Amino acid sequence: MQFLPLFHKLQGRPVLVIGGGEVALRKARLLSDAGARLRVVAPEIRSELQELAGADGICLRGYASSDLQGVALVIAATDDEPLNARISAEAQAQGIPVNVVDAPALCSVIFPAIVDRSPLIVAVSSGGDAPVLARLIRAKIETWIPATYGQLANLGKRFRDRVKQLFPDVQQRRVFWEDVFQGQIAESVFAGKPEEGERLLEERLAGAAPRALGEVYLVGAGPGDPDLLTFRALRLMQQADVVLYDRLVAPAIIELCRRDAERIYVGKRRADHAVPQEQINQLLIDLARQGKRVLRLKGGDPFIFGRGGEEIEQLAAEDIPFQVVPGITAASGCAAYAGIPLTHRDHAQSVRFVTGHLKDGSSNLPWKDLVAPGQTLVFYMGLVGLYGICEQLIAHGRSAATPAALVQQGTTQNQRVFTGTLETLPQLVAQHEVHAPTLVIVGEVVTLRDKLAWFEGAQGSL
């Protein structure tokens, strides 16, 4: 190990930055965030850097050895290599930590790549050998640690002394904090409810038993590509005890769930419901009452034709804790991967999402509104009733030559896209054996696919 990771408290302490350009500015921003008192020396100094240092911290001249007097840290950020080497030698001779930007051999300290969730700080370093790799690893860590971890750390800080008094034994304290940071208290903070998290922690310290009640996570899995999951969705997927998933959730996404979680298929298709909706609702309640963390995983977005509202209505009625994580809805994801912008200044000023399968099985849609000019229509679950949809749109005034598209299994390697018109779309379904899940897009924007298509599945498109 070439460098020992340490954290340097710089609040109120003088730090010398030699250099006045972009590199010096980047270092100065970081030092300012840490509360350091900046002293910047350079013949020319950028205005933003001058603002950071203040009038008393600016010296518009070259470096002098006397500048090192009384400083806690030195940063050499000039493009003069001999000068940088001199600064390094003089600082180290006086026992002052020194960092020479992009010259690890001249450094006694180096800057790591930082994930800032203050007061929680994560530092990643390659010892100066591969800084780009360190930044890439930092980016991965950024996705694993929600921004609200800082709030959770602050909550722990406020209660630390009380917990220490209550649990003098180190092992007992460790078990207590592990439960806090991995359980309902932490989830309340992550869900944007810090007051609830603090209340639950107060209850625990007052002697209340841990809640036996679990929680339900209603999570949108997006249209199929696992890369389109949100950070929060992925985190909850990896900590749930039980997963209830729909037919439209891609297998690759299900595989990202916790390995030892129980998986329950509750998918539906037309006239074939593996588990009736009422039974799904009750199952969510029963599992949560067993103290389990229950993931309800739905394709697309749970609040757009996903019956998510119905499910959480039941949870709310039974006082079951829940949180909702939106997902990229099929219209957005599939249209983007098909190269079809849903709105465009020259073609469509609005877009409508329409279900092609209503609760009573009818197609009683506001057809007069749906044929208004300047809009794009996106039909979910419209494949079975496609002939009737096209017929009604034409009958109510939409031109039979209106461009239209079918996007099957959009955003995945199995994606297929077929373009035609309202008149020819039903024929394309039969000709190419198109099957669900397929999205129907109607409007002039479909013509842009010829220029904007950028993603093709393994089976190609027409």
From Swiss-Prot:
GO function term, MF aspect, one: NAD binding
Pathway membership: Cofactor biosynthesis; adenosylcobalamin biosynthesis; precorrin-2 from uroporphyrinogen III: step 1/1; Cofactor biosynthesis; adenosylcobalamin biosynthesis; sirohydrochlorin from precorrin-2: step 1/1; Porphyrin-containing compound metabolism; siroheme biosynthesis; precorrin-2 from uroporphyrinogen III: step 1/1; Porphyrin-containing compound metabolism; siroheme biosynthesis; siroheme from sirohydrochlorin: step 1/1
Any one GO BP annotation for this protein: cobalamin biosynthetic process
Active-site feature positions: D246 (proton acceptor), K268 (proton donor)
Residues where Phosphoserine is found: S126
Species this chain originates from: Ectopseudomonas mendocina (strain ymp) (Pseudomonas mendocina)
Family assignment from sequence similarity: In the N-terminal section; belongs to the precorrin-2 dehydrogenase / sirohydrochlorin ferrochelatase family. In the C-terminal section; belongs to the precorrin methyltransferase family.
Ligand binding (NAD(+)): E22, V23, P43, E44
E.C. code: 2.1.1.107, 1.3.1.76, 4.99.1.4
InterPro entries, per the entry: 4pyrrol_Mease, 4pyrrol_Methylase_sf, 4pyrrole_Mease_sub1, 4pyrrole_Mease_sub2, CobA/CysG_C, NAD(P)-bd_dom_sf, Siro_Cobalamin_biosynth, Sirohaem_synt_dimer_dom_sf
Protein name: Siroheme synthase
Binding site for S-adenosyl-L-methionine: P223, G299, G300, D301, I304, T329, A330, M381, G410
Cited PROSITE patterns: SUMT_2 (PS00840)
Lineage of the species this protein comes from: Bacteria, Pseudomonadati, Pseudomonadota, Gammaproteobacteria, Pseudomonadales
Pfam family, one: TP_methylase
Precorrin-2 dehydrogenase /sirohydrochlorin ferrochelatase, as annotated region: 1-201
Role summary: Then it catalyzes the NAD-dependent ring dehydrogenation of precorrin-2 to yield sirohydrochlorin. Finally, it catalyzes the ferrochelation of sirohydrochlorin to yield siroheme.
Residue ranges of the region described as Uroporphyrinogen-III C-methyltransferase: 214-462
Keywords assigned by UniProt, alphabetized: Cobalamin biosynthesis, Lyase, Methyltransferase, Multifunctional enzyme, NAD, Oxidoreductase, Phosphoprotein, Porphyrin biosynthesis, S-adenosyl-L-methionine, Transferase
Catalytic activity: uroporphyrinogen III + 2 S-adenosyl-L-methionine = precorrin-2 + 2 S-adenosyl-L-homocysteine + H(+); precorrin-2 + NAD(+) = sirohydrochlorin + NADH + 2 H(+); siroheme + 2 H(+) = sirohydrochlorin + Fe(2+)
Domain of life: Bacteria
